[in-house]
Amino acid sequence: MITCTLRYVIDPYRLAEFETYAKMWIPLVERFGGQHHGYFLPSEGANNIALALFSFPSLAAYEIYREQSRHDAACQAAFQYADETRCIVSYERSFMRPVFG
């Protein structure tokens, strides 16, 4: 299993728009075979950092999702929404592997 961790720098004045964006992506990742672990929005501390975590069985499965999402109308609508609302300033993507006890 591989877990994609996204760290977003968001516009804190557009938090509601970012939450809408997040809710768009959760079912999309799951439709493409991923397991979404949720978005984590600012509560205390920095008001412009948000996280998202989702997993795929392998990096190859993730790459298939990335390729298919480029051609999916709902995914493109989510990207367009983020562009139009400018709720995301920047983001970085990391891949992690879980360790269980």
Language-model segments: what does each one mean?
Residues 2-7, 18, 29, 50-53:
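Short, structured motif recognition centered on aromatic/hydrophobic residues
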Residues 7-12, 54-58:
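Short beta-strand-to-loop capping motifs
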Residues 10-20:
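Short, surface-exposed ligand-recognition loops at beta-strand->loop->(often short) alpha-helix junctions
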Residues 14-16, 60-62, 101:
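Residue-level signal for secondary-structure boundary sites
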Residues 20-37, 55-92:
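An amphipathic, aromatic/His-enriched active-site/gating alpha helix that lines ligand/cofactor pockets
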Residues 45-48:
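Short acidic/glycine-enriched loop/turn segments that link adjacent beta-strands
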Residues 92-101:
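Long, low-complexity, Ser/Thr/Gly/Pro-rich intrinsically disordered segments that act as flexible linkers
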